[in-house]
Amino acid sequence: MRTRLWDAASAVYERLLTREIDGAPAHVAVIQDGNRRYAREHGDDPTDGYQSGARTTERVLEWCSDLGVEELTLYAFSTENFERPPDQQQHLFDLLESKLREFADADRVHADRVRIRAIGDTGRLPQRVRDAITYAESRTAGYDGFTLNVALAYGGRDELLTAARGVADAVAAGDLDPADIDAQAIESRLHTSPVRDVDLIIRTGGDERTSNFLPWHANGSEAAVFFCTPYWPEFSKVDLLRAIRTYESRAASWRQTRAKRALALVRALGSEVGEARRVLDRFKGALPDPPEDVEAETQSAD
């Protein structure tokens, strides 16, 4: 009885939140945290938690597409994950391999024209996972309806260091003038190139940190951040809608701030123009008349 009441209340709340949404963020990035803790609290193995999380990933992909999100980036395997026990790594590799191939063959992926891309230092992954990446990317390479980025062997600090080394190597080789180093020189050497700036970062599992996820693209757009307590397998559409509402609130606040700044600038400029006119009027009578030849040239030019 209690479960039915909760489900009914959640459905009503979901409809209310959906009505409040007035435009989804273009790019959402998700840190999928809490799979192992979810499994532990349910008396299951960590592998069961990852399987449950994978099912949530499928649902979130559908929700984002339905809500008008254009790009979704999932933090599937970080560089820190290489430090986990070998058996956990192998299970994650098994799951990644199977899900990449499954997504690449899914009817909805092709119906919605979803392009799948892997971002990160993928050369560190086992060959079978790299083969699955190649399969998924090649199967969806021509699509432009929605973009799904899967961050694999990804670390934000590692990405920036790699880009910096690439710039240094280009300068040393004489291919890049130090004076020409700009944001584009860095961005073109990122693992994530080309990826649009992030509008909203979501982290599940209760931790309030972004784990250096997409630092270049998140800071570039000053992305909104939404932390929530549900573990990734528990993440619901209501949680996603609440995150988007947070993004919209922040975007509205930023628009208001920019409008206030623009108004203040207009007022300042208006004050300066008014003062200049008053000074000009004050000295207008003291200014000498233009010479006759200058006046004649002016009239002929008219």
Swiss-Prot record:
Annotated GO biological process: polyprenol biosynthetic process
Reaction(s) this enzyme catalyzes, per UniProt: geranylgeranyl diphosphate + 7 isopentenyl diphosphate = tri-trans,hepta-cis-undecaprenyl diphosphate + 7 diphosphate
Enzyme Commission number, as recorded: 2.5.1.89
Chain residues that bind Mg(2+): D33
Molecular function terms, GO-annotated: magnesium ion binding; prenyltransferase activity
Key words, A-Z: Magnesium, Metal-binding, Transferase
Swiss-Prot/TrEMBL cofactor(s): Mg(2+)
Free-text comment on the cofactor: Binds 2 magnesium ions per subunit.
Family membership: Belongs to the UPP synthase family.
Subunit details: Homodimer.
Function per UniProt: Catalyzes the sequential condensation of isopentenyl diphosphate (IPP) with geranylgeranyl diphosphate (GGPP) to yield (2Z,6Z,10Z,14Z,18Z,22Z,26Z,30E,34E,38E)-undecaprenyl diphosphate (tritrans,heptacis-UPP). It is probably the precursor of glycosyl carrier lipids.
Name of the protein in its database record: Tritrans,polycis-undecaprenyl-diphosphate synthase (geranylgeranyl-diphosphate specific)
Organism: Halobacterium salinarum (strain ATCC 700922 / JCM 11081 / NRC-1) (Halobacterium halobium)
Gene that specifies this protein: uppS
